[in-house]
Structures are given as structure tokens and as C-alpha cells.
Design a protein with these regions (language model features):
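Short beta-strand/turn micro-motifs at beta-sheet edges
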Residues: 30-33, 259-261
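Extended amphipathic secondary-structure runs
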Residues: 167-183, 244-259, 264-267
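C-terminal outer-membrane beta-barrel translocator/porin domains of Gram-negative envelope proteins
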Residues: 239, 249-252, 260-338
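Sequence/structural signature of outer-membrane beta-barrel proteins
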Residues: 64-68, 82-88, 115-119, 190-192, ...
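Hydrophobic, lipid-facing positions within transmembrane beta-strands of outer-membrane proteins
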Residues: 41-43, 57-59, 91-95, 163-169, ...
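Cleavable N-terminal export/targeting peptides
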Residues: 1-30
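Gram-negative/organellar outer-membrane beta-barrel architecture
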Residues: 33-42, 48-241
């Protein structure tokens, strides 16, 4: 009886051992990569310095949940978070969630972003035909050269203040194999003004009564930037000059044959969609800003070509965005719908 019990115990001990070995073997995919299970994440800190925007500190992380790994390299849940900010009001705060398992047979993507920008680029209208003079904003270290270059205005001449808030909720479903439909809603909030020169100058904001000039590296707050001039000349309407809020609706089709969503090594991703964007400015009211309701069409094509196994991939993309109805405010002309 004791021998039978010992033999039974031996079987119970040995069988789990074989099962564990078998499970360990299965934790490698067809390319020899280790299959990830459970929760995985990485953190990347960031430190930077800009002469005008100051010191930056921040970090980003991407958290993935793979469950038992049976669907790897596809994840079950993905949460991306990023926060970075400078001492002169520039940064990004973003949270993004993505999953095709929270709602069965549908992919849900949620994104909330806030981007303060104390010195956002503004080079005027009409693309390459607009006048650009680098001497307007290129500060020279040698004060004698600065005296010769009378064109110099301010390092903030081609800048303006733009804070952007964005929230988006998108859902995707399958029509047939790699062909999918997608729809989404969201809101864009633009808060715009001229650059805060006093804040940007900081300790350099010193005015010398004797010379009637600011400190050598300080920007003169009495000098108008291109944005202020456009408002003054009427090229930028008062109803759009300070920004506004824009709820939008989106719908389209997608073709996706990529082998994986993150870091694909082969396949094609193409989408075509329409976005209808409304406009509202609390100061001027809906009637004044209704002229900025507009409809846009987007087409994007991405192709991933394997060069060496899954180690080296050649990728290229083309895309277009066209306003097909209505008028978009000037600050949204550089925003690319995705």
C-alpha cells in the first residue's frame, strides 16, 4: 500500500514537471521570440533645455496587458501616458487607451491630450509664397552685428501662444477580413494669444533707462509679432483670433493587413474618412463662429516591407487632407486629422 501511495505521489510530482516544461516551450512564437504574458510596461524619462522655453522634465510609459499570451503579439489592453513640461509653459500631457477586447469584436480607442505652447510657430498664410526673413527673429550674439542687422525684430516674431486640448473616442469594427469601418467623436479646444514676452524673458526682462533698451538677450515686448500684425491687418478675423472649441464627428473605411499593430514588419494600412467639425467661441457666440463649420476628407496609405526577417523593415507613407466644404479657422489649418 505504501508503494502504491509513493508511486502515485511520484506521478503527481512528475506530471506537473512535464506540463511546466511543455508550457515553457510554448512561450516562444514561430520566429523564436518570447511570448509576453500578463502585464508589461516600460518607463522613459526625459530631460531637455531650450534657451527660450527653459528646462524640461517629464516621463512617458506604455502599459500592456497580454493575458495568457494566446493572442500575442496582439495585446488585450494598452495604456499610454506621457507628461512633460518646461519652466516656460511648453509641454504635453497625454493619456491614451486602446483595446479590441473591451467591446467584443470592436476596437475602442480613447485619447485625452493637453499641449501648452508658449511659442508656437506662425509663418503666415499662402505656404511657400509667404514672405520669410530669418533676420526678423535670428538674434546675433555680437551686439555690433545686431546694430548692423536692422531687420531684427524679436525671437518671438514668428511665434504665438497656443494651448490645445483634445479629446477623441473612436471605435472600429470589421466588415470583411481586413476591411473595417470606423467612426469617432471628439472635441478640439484652442486657446490662443500673443506671446507673453515678460514670462519668456524671465530674469532677462531688464529695461535700461539710460539706453532705453532691454537687456541684450531680452525680447522687446513692444515689438509686434507676425500674429499680432495679421490680426491688426484683418487677415485673421476677430472671431478666430483667440481660438475656440470644435466638436467633431468622423466616419470612414480602413484596410489593415499589418502583421501586428505595434512595430509592424509587413503589410498595408490605408484609411479614408470624412470629418465634420463645428465651431464655437464663447466670446463671440455661435452665430459669429458658424462660418467656421467645415468638412474635410483624409486619405492615408502606409506600406511596410520586410528587408531582413523581422529585424529590418522598410516603411513609407503618403497622405492628403482636403477641405471640401466650409472654412476652417487659421489655427486648424496645420492640424492633421488621424
Amino acid at each position: 500500500m505504501k508503494r502504491i501511495i509513493i508511486f502515485a505521489i511520484s506521478i503527481l510530482i512528475v506530471l506537473p514537471t512535464f506540463a511546466a516544461k511543455k508550457e515553457k516551450v510554448q512561450q516562444v512564437d514561430s520566429l523564436g521570440r518570447k511570448i509576453k504574458t500578463g502585464w508589461n510596461f516600460g518607463v522613459l524619462p526625459s530631460v531637455a533645455f531650450d534657451a527660450d522655453l527653459g528646462f524640461q522634465g517629464g516621463a512617458l510609459t506604455n502599459i500592456y496587458y497580454y493575458g495568457d499570451g494566446s493572442q500575442y503579439p496582439e495585446y488585450i489592453h494598452s495604456l499610454y501616458a506621457e507628461a512633460a513640461y518646461t519652466t516656460k509653459n511648453y509641454g504635453i500631457f497625454r493619456v491614451n487607451y486602446d483595446s479590441k477586447y473591451l467591446i467584443p469584436k470592436h476596437r475602442l480607442t480613447l485619447d485625452a491630450t493637453y499641449q501648452p505652447d508658449a511659442m508656437c510657430d506662425f509663418y503666415g498664410f499662402n505656404g511657400y509664397q509667404s514672405v520669410y526673413n530669418q533676420d526678423f527673429h535670428k538674434w546675433k550674439k555680437d551686439p555690433e552685428k545686431m546694430g548692423v542687422l536692422e531687420d531684427y525684430q524679436s525671437r518671438a516674431f514668428y511665434k504665438y501662444k497656443r494651448d490645445l486640448f483634445r479629446f477623441a473616442a473612436d471605435i472600429e469594427g470589421t466588415i470583411w477580413k481586413n476591411i473595417k469601418w470606423n467612426a469617432g467623436v471628439g472635441v478640439l479646444g484652442y486657446m490662443i494669444d500673443e506671446c507673453d514676452i515678460d514670462m519668456l524673458n524671465g530674469k532677462k526682462n531688464v529695461f535700461d533707462p539710460a539706453t532705453e533698451r532691454y537687456a541684450q538677450k531680452a525680447m522687446d515686448k513692444n515689438v509686434e509679432g507676425l500674429y499680432e500684425k495679421y490680426v491688426k491687418w484683418g487677415l485673421i478675423d476677430q472671431a478666430e483670433a483667440k481660438g475656440g472649441w470644435h466638436p467633431y464627428l468622423r466616419a470612414g473605411l480602413t484596410y489593415d493587413s499589418r502583421d501586428q499593430r505595434t512595430c509592424p514588419t509587413k503589410g498595408i494600412y490605408a484609411d479614408a474618412f470624412f470629418t465634420y467639425t463645428a465651431a464655437f467661441n464663447a466670446k463671440y457666440g455661435q452665430q459669429a463662429t458658424a462660418g467656421y463649420n467645415h468638412l474635410q476628407f483624409n486619405f492615408n496609405f502606409r506600406h511596410y516591407v520586410p528587408v531582413y526577417r523581422d529585424r529590418v523593415t522598410f516603411a513609407y507613407r503618403i497622405g492628403t487632407q482636403n477641405n471640401i466644404a466650409g472654412k476652417s479657422p487659421f489655427y486648424m489649418n496645420t492640424y492633421l486629422n488621424t
